Curated annotation (Swiss-Prot):
Belongs to the inorganic carbon transporter (TC 9.A.2) DabA family. HAMAP family: DabA (MF_01871). Zn(2+) binds at residues 398, 400, 580, 595. This is Probable inorganic carbon transporter subunit DabA. The gene is dabA.
């Protein structure tokens, strides 16, 4: 089964077109094929993405079966993961039995139900068939005497690259040889920061630059270079010619392109991301495929034509018979006594109840157990909303799962109310920090910025700050320049050795003290002056996006965010907008620990901009006219939650009213205890950390500053649910840092627009994060990025294992694994729980086709809690 057969009906229409039409539609063909890979962002702005985002029109089960066939990639949890989860009480057997019964009811078979159930029960133990049984002469002789099952013949339509079917004289698979060449060209073209001597003609595009150099490539043989000597000048022509000379039928070309894209999904993903960033490179995926398949032709041409380029693949009945012998307790003698019809029925049943089906039932039981446990946690807390304590401060945190423990401990220690909101606070902005010539899109990667906000300072103070920055940057620039120069690179070790040697020793043995000293030194040296923002709209034709906001836009963004969390009345004297950031050393994945809603950056900038907008008199007056009355003595401030050390760093505190100052002092007084408790809870979950922690905060700082620490924090591992509702629904619940929490009051959302926005924005971000962790756990060899300790940071783009691997797209082993054999992250698809009446959910599903498709196809799970507290699974 090819993904071509399940992606779209458009693809099927192209099967009968001739070569001229095929060439004309090459853009469409490549675009359709590109759905099998996901765009890969550079590691410096690591953005959560899930690798199957282009395949959500198919069910999770269909994609799982296709990947198993096409790439031998299993995206269901392994047997060891399932057994471990069951041993820890994460899977209830009753849910597995319900799932099995439902599956049997959906199947058509003509064997006794009791026989089928007995077979399935044994098969669900997930034991491997003994190799001695599979290789036994008796079994193989029996298989020869039995004809193939009628439905067992299937065509392998996944169209593996021809190079993967051939080995050279050295025994090397030619697909590995091809990958080696393609990795080299990708590194040369995509390198933005590593080399001082860039690829010639790079500005003309990948294909033109490659075409200019390929005939001089010493890594190719004379005959291989000869094939490419008079090759077409344009990528589309080259791709069409290569496919034709390889003998790929027009009806199979999309499947063939898919096979090549999946051969190096990391590099192909980076190519696809680049193609989406500018019009200049929008044809980059076609260029990549043209280079790859042209080189494939040059490498495999001596071996063409192949006799069995696309052979029919038959289902071996040996493991099917063995499964009935081992799990169904049917002897070989009993097999021989059966009629051909009975044999065919048994084999067909075993074929349908394959490994993927068994693991699917286990995964669903695991997910249902989690949902039931979450339901019990929520329903066990009977809260009296009319008995609320007096609130002196309200704090809005990002929905990030790491906020949940911090919020829980903060609420326990004082009269505080917390809210959950996407960490960009609904501001579609690109941020430009003081002195920076570049801007960073500080919003979810699924959105595009509409405004640019610049950080500004007094001219004299800014000049002083710039001078200090230049001194700091000149040191690193000089070091980098000397390292790349032929002559000075030999002198560099002598010059820098003593200083770097001292740094290595001190950072290795006293990391917390030295790291803190260096951090404070840089902080003092590069202390920013007092800054403001370019909040007012400026029409600048030189900028791609406008600077600042109009008055209407200011009011609109504040109104939207306040309504989204239900904060439109009963304002506390102090309202704190809390972005979040991480703190780690020598960590290429630092951006993965930052705010996903801010495009892999810290959320403090957005928090400060939003708080500043809320304090503007013009904004408050306009909101008051609409019925959102913010008291004069209510002050908005901004802070940053540092997730690695669980501290709150104040970044914007304007002049406070008396009541707001009292609230501020109250927060400050409890914050050390909040940090201690949150750090204690978090640190005990780290592997090999079973000792009693005397000073959790001190230990957390050591993890953050230790440059040999491969796991400064767990990040968003174990995320499993996204709860959309009022805080009373989850207050006092220990959700174990596994839930994204977004405030929502359905009573303030009569038309459902707020709920739709939450699902389309934060809901999508949470789903991408969830499935990225899922994929990196179940298939780390394909969707993960291996061990941090052996990674190589490449061209400022990402990481590789060694210098000739795929660009690794997922999370490292240390982000999801407790040990070599034990996972920390539970690979469950995201459960979205919405607190709203049933009619709200029905309206959402009717209006949002994309979300309905995700639910129906098994990419997310959905449940709701109505006004009476009744839980419903959708």
């Amino acid at each position: 089964m090819s993904i071509q057969s399940i992606v779209t009906k458009e693809t099927l229409k192209k099967k009968d077109t001739n070569i001229e039409i095929q060439e004309k539609n090459m853009n469409d063909l490549v675009e359709s094929a590109s759905r099998v890979i996901a765009p890969l962002w550079p590691i410096s702005t690591f953005a959560a993405h899930h690798p199957w985002m282009g395949l959500e029109k198919q069910s999770f089960e269909q994609v799982a079966n296709w990947l198993k066939e096409a790439r031998n990639v299993d995206i269901y949890p392994s047997a060891s993961m399932i057994h471990s989860a069951k041993a820890k009480g994460e899977i209830e057997e009753s849910f597995l039995q319900i799932g099995l019964s439902r599956w049997l009811d959906s199947q058509s078979f003509h064997i006794p139900r009791e026989t089928a159930e007995r077979f399935c029960q044994e098969a669900l133990k997930l034991e491997r068939l003994p190799s001695s049984l599979l290789s036994s002469p008796e079994l193989n002789k029996l298989a020869e005497e039995i004809s193939y099952i009628n439905t067992g013949s299937m065509e392998d339509s996944s169209m593996q690259p021809i190079s993967s079917l051939i080995e050279n004289q050295k025994g090397d698979n030619l697909s590995d040889v091809l990958n080696y060449h393609i990795i080299k060209w990708c590194k040369l073209y995509l390198d933005d920061s590593g080399s001082s001597w860039t690829m010639p003609n790079r500005e003309k595009g990948l294909y033109r630059a490659w075409h200019h150099l390929i005939t001089f490539d010493p890594a190719l043989s004379k005959n291989e270079r000869k094939v490419l000597k008079d090759w077409p000048q344009d990528a589309q022509g080259a791709l069409t010619k290569a496919l034709s000379e390889l003998g790929i039928p027009e009806s199979n070309r999309q499947a063939y392109l898919e096979g090549h894209l999946l051969s190096l999904p990391g590099w192909a993903g980076m190519i696809r991301w680049r193609s989406q960033q500018s019009i200049k490179e929008q044809a980059l995926v076609i260029e990549y495929l043209a280079v790859r398949i042209s080189m494939e032709l040059a490498i495999v041409k001596p071996y063409l034509p192949l006799k069995n380029q696309k052979a029919e693949k038959k289902v071996s009945i040996v493991p099917l018979i063995a499964s009935w012998i081992y799990w169904g307790d049917i002897s070989t003698r009993e097999w021989l006594q059966m009629s051909a019809t009975e044999q065919s029925e048994l084999l067909a049943f075993a074929y349908r109840f394959d490994e993927n089906t068994r693991k699917k039932l286990w995964l669903e039981a695991w997910e249902q157990t989690h949902a039931e446990q979450l339901k019990k946690k929520i329903s066990s807390k009977q809260r009296a909303t009319n008995d609320k304590k007096r609130v002196v401060a309200q704090l809005a945190f990002c929905i990030d799962v790491r906020s949940e423990p911090f919020r829980r401990h903060l609420e326990k220690l004082g009269p505080f109310e917390t809210f959950g909101i996407a960490g960009f606070f609904g501001l579609p902005i690109a941020t430009s920090e003081l002195g920076s010539n570049n801007s960073h899109p500080s919003l979810p990667v699924i959105l595009k910025p509409k405004h640019q906000i610049k950080e500004l300072a007094d001219e004299n103070e800014y000049k002083s700050y710039e001078q200090r920055k230049k001194i700091d940057s000149s040191v690193s620039y000089t070091f980098k320049t000397m390292k790349k120069n032929v002559l000075t690179s030999m002198l560099l070790p002598e010059v820098s050795g003593p200083l770097l040697g001292l740094q290595m020793i001190t950072r290795s043995f006293v990391p917390r003290r030295v790291g803190g000293f260096i951090r404070n030194l840089r902080k003092n040296m590069l202390q920013k002056p007092n800054t403001t923002f370019s909040l007012n709209h400026v029409h600048d034709t030189k900028c791609e996006i406008p600077i600042g906001f109009t008055k209407e836009e200011k009011v609109n963004y504040v109104r939207q965010a306040l309504k989204m969390v239900g904060l439109t009345e009963k304002f506390a004297p102090l309202v704190v907008m809390c972005g979040h950031s991480s703190q780690s050393t020598n960590n290429p994945y630092a951006a993965a620990l930052e705010c996903g809603a801010c495009g892999g950056a810290a959320g403090g900038f957005n928090a400060r901009v939003f708080a500043t907008l809320c304090n503007l008199p013009e904004v408050r007056e306009a909101l008051s006219a609409e019925g959102i009355k913010i008291p004069e003595d209510t002050i908005f401030a901004a802070a940053e939650h540092k997730t690695t050390v669980d501290e709150l760093d104040w970044i914007y505190v304007p002049e406070l009213s008396e009541a707001a100052q009292e609230a501020f002092d109250n927060i400050e007084s409890v914050m050390p205890n909040v940090s201690q408790e949150a750090n204690r809870e978090r640190l005990t979950q780290l592997p090999n950390f079973k000792m009693k922690i005397k000073n959790p905060s001190k230990e957390a700082h050591r993890f953050a500053e230790d440059w040999s620490e491969i796991r400064p924090e767990w990040g968003l591992a174990r995320n499993a649910s996204f709860i959309i509702g009022q805080r009373e629904l989850t207050q006092d619940c220990d959700l174990e840092g596994r839930a994204f929490l977004h405030n929502y009051d359905w009573k303030q959302d009569e038309n459902g627009d707020i709920l739709a926005s939450i699902i389309a924005g934060p809901g999508t971000v949470a789903q991408w994060i969830n499935l990225q962790y899922y994929a990196s756990t179940v298939a780390p060899h394909y969707y993960g990025s291996g061990n941090k300790t052996t990674q190589t940071v490449t061209a400022g783009l990402g990481v590789m294992q060694g210098n000739a691997s795929d660009l690794l797209s997922g999370l490292p082993w240390q982000s999801v694994m407790q040990s070599d054999s034990e996972t920390y992250h539970s690979p469950l698809r995201l459960l979205i729980v919405i607190q709203a009446p049933t009619k709200y959910i029905e309206r959402l599903l009717n209006n949002d086709f994309t979300f309905r498709e995700k639910v129906q196809n098994g990419w997310v799970r959905l449940a709701s809690v109505d006004s009476e507290g009744r839980w419903k699974n959708w």
